[in-house]
């Protein structure tokens, strides 16, 4: 008799699409005879695993003893024509796998997730071959989806139709797969000054200053360009890394070496900065590092001094507080984006440009980056998502994503998987509720964000986790001041002098502070390794990037990290909170929801 376990029976029910089935239907799903299925089902019934019912004159039907076993099971339903995948109750592994090939578009409170497979997802999928990508998709889906797979094959092929290379004489060549693509796509789409002259029926000479516009134009036309040019290594700079890279970090560096440009995508705490130092060692040329803040510039300097052979006189910072250009220069995006400081891009023969928190790249810096296409380029981010959806800026100006499954990092213990909980807080009283109902626009959103009842909930959570340092994020200064006073903690915001910021950050790192309240300046890569417990009191609308960054402040190795996201019950803030956590859901992080435990 063929062995049919309860799990195989439940799988068969899903294939049938009904909660009850006959032995004939089960046999058809499991590819066995009806007699074999009937005997196996009878054995399961004898073990109290399934139930049977006579529904004469119809045949006997079989169903699970516990109906919840059906509703709580993971179920994946593909819609190939729409290129959508709906998943109910997905496991952490399933969500992590889906994040490599699809884009999460919606979630529900009942545990359903909707993914869309976009052309950009296929182009940026972290697979070395089409067969590997197809295998990953087919392994996820419960049935064959030939139309979806065929579309994926077409998109993968489109990403190989155009290639940039360096001619033996040193100039840039655009190479098309066919003469039709060169004539009917490239020559038709590109401005007249991009292609200087034809070389053959499938090749053209590219103006060096037009490489970035070429890549952007063809990307928007549906043909991402493979960039195989020989890039400049700049003025030589010998650098030795004093750390051993983790296996996935070495893989990042190896893949960057092969491509000469790309974006490292990994959770905070995974060591992207260390991997970037490995890339600096590999390129062996003078390097410009661009960062969002002065604090990050200082951290980069300290990390380089501690972990490489670079000396203090080889590293310069370029921002509002200091302006020194050295073989390795760390500049803020804000300063580098100013017209009067544009010379920082040209002062030295840079061999490598590093864009830390690359999703923050301002338009001014992006435009100037268009002239840096001959340099090695490396972006670092926990999420390449930009809320204005300008992913093409990052893809074409810096490079395609180079990533590692978050799930693998969690399992290996390199990064702490946060426990994320969205807590819905009621209004403090009817007066607050009525004021919200009468308001509109920004005032309405701010009232929900600054709901006074959140302050009591935060105090309760901090008391409940009293043996752990607490980090509290706010978006509004007045709210931050009230919470800081309630917790007897410092409040660090954009108005806090840099010297005092560093004092408070050092106090938090060393354990001298039990709690710290921060505004948006704490969203980025400021290193707070002991922040194992965090509360988000208010957030930037539905910003997925901000959600990932704030959760990332707790994602450090060797810790049990907790993140609570507060949202006012019965307001649009509920949807915003779920949206902010959506990116974490795509990466395999389990996000739960509950009501506030401390009522006003």
UniProtKB/Swiss-Prot annotation:
Query: Per its UniProt record, what SMART domains does this chain match?
Result: DEXDc (SM00487), HELICc (SM00490)
Instruction: Keywords in alphabetical order, please.
Output: ATP-binding, Helicase, Hydrolase, Isomerase, Nucleotide-binding
Q: Where is this region: Disordered?
A: 569-600
Q: Which GO terms describe its molecular function?
A: ATP binding; ATP hydrolysis activity; catalytic activity, acting on DNA; DNA binding; helicase activity
Motif (DEAH box) positions are: 356-359
Q: Which SUPFAM superfamilies match?
A: P-loop containing nucleoside triphosphate hydrolases (SSF52540)
**Swiss-Prot/TrEMBL catalytic activity:** Couples ATP hydrolysis with the unwinding of duplex DNA by translocating in the 3'-5' direction; ATP + H2O = ADP + phosphate + H(+)
Bias-annotated ranges (Basic and acidic residues): 590-600
Q: What is its EC number?
A: 5.6.2.4
Which PROSITE patterns does this UniProt record tie to the protein? HELICASE_ATP_BIND_1 (PS51192), HELICASE_CTER (PS51194)
Question: Which residues does the annotation say bind ATP?
Answer: 266-273
Origin superkingdom:
Archaea
Domain (Helicase ATP-binding) spans 253-402
Q: What InterPro entries does the annotation carry?
A: ATP-dep_DNA_Helicase, ERCC3_RAD25_C, Helicase/UvrB_N, Helicase_ATP-bd, Helicase_C-like, Helicase_Rad25_arc, P-loop_NTPase
* Enzyme type, top EC level: isomerase
Q: Which Pfam families match?
A: ERCC3_RAD25_C, ResIII
Q: Where is the Helicase C-terminal domain?
A: 457-600
Q: Which HAMAP family match?
A: Helicase_Rad25_arch (MF_01489)
Q: Which family does it belong to?
A: Belongs to the helicase family. RAD25/XPB subfamily.
Q: What is this protein called?
A: Putative DNA 3'-5' helicase Rad25
Source gene? rad25
């Amino acid at each position: 008799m063929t062995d049919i376990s309860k799990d195989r029976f439940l799988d068969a029910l899903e294939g049938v699409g009904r909660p009850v089935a006959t032995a004939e239907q089960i046999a058809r799903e499991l590819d066995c005879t009806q007699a074999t299925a009937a005997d196996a089902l009878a054995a399961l019934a004898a073990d109290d695993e399934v139930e049977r019912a006579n529904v004469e004159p119809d045949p006997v039907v079989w169903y699970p003893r516990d109906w919840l076993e059906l509703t709580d099971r993971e179920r994946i339903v593909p819609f190939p024509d729409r290129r959508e995948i709906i998943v109910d109750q997905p496991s952490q592994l399933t969500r992590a796998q889906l994040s490599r090939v699809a884009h999460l578009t919606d979630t529900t409170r009942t545990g359903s997730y909707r993914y869309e497979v976009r052309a950009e997802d296929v182009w940026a999928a972290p697979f070395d071959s089409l067969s590997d990508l197809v295998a990953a998709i087919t392994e996820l889906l419960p049935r064959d989806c030939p139309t979806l797979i065929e579309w994926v094959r077409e998109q993968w092929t489109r990403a190989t139709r155009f290639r940039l290379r360096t001619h033996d004489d040193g100039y840039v060549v655009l190479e098309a797969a066919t003469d039709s693509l060169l004539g009917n796509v490239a020559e038709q789409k590109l401005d007249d000054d991009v292609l200087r002259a034809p070389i053959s029926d499938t090749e053209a000479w590219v103006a060096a200053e037009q490489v970035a516009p070429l890549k952007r134009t063809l990307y928007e036309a549906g043909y991402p360009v493979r960039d195989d040019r020989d890039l400049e290594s700049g003025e030589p700079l010998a650098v030795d890394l004093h750390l051993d890279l983790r296996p996935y970090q070495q893989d990042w560096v190896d893949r960057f070496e092969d491509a000469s440009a790309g974006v490292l995508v990994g959770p905070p705490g995974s060591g992207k900065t260390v991997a970037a130092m490995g890339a600096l060692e590999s390129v062996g040329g003078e390097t410009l590092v661009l960062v969002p803040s002065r604090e990050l510039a200082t951290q980069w300097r300290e990390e380089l001094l501690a972990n490489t052979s670079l000396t203090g006189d080889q590293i310069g910072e370029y921002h509002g507080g200091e302006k020194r250009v050295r073989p390795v220069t760390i500049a803020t995006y804000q300063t580098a984006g100013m017209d009067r400081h544009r010379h920082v891009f040209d002062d030295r023969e840079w061999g490598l440009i590093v864009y830390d928190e690359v999703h923050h790249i301002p338009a001014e810096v992006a435009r100037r980056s268009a002239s840096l296409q001959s340099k090695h380029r490396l972006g670092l981010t926990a999420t390449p998502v930009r809320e204005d959806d300008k992913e093409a800026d990052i893809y074409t100006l810096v490079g395609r994503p180079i990533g590692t499954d978050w799930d693998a990092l969690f399992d290996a213990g390199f990064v702490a998987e946060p426990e994320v909980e969205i807590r819905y807080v009621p209004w403090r009283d009817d007066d607050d509720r009525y004021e919200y109902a009468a308001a509109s626009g920004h005032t309405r959103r701010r009232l929900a964000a600054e709901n006074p009842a959140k302050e009591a909930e935060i105090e309760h959570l901090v008391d409940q986790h009293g043996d752990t340092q607490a980090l509290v994020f706010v978006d509004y200064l007045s709210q931050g001041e009230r919470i800081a006073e309630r917790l007897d903690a410092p409040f660090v915001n954009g108005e806090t002098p840099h010297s005092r910021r560093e004092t408070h950050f050092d106090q938090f790192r060393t354990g001298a502070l039990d709690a710290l309240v921060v505004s948006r300046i704490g969203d980025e890569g400021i290193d707070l390794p002991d922040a194992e417990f965090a509360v988000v009191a208010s957030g930037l609308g539905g910003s997925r990037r901000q959600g990932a960054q704030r959760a990332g402040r707790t994602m450090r190795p060797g810790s049990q990290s907790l993140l609570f996201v507060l949202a006012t019950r019965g307001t649009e803030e509920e949807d915003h909170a779920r949206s902010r956590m959506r990116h974490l859901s795509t990466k395999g992080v389990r996000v739960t929801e509950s009501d506030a435990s401390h009522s006003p």
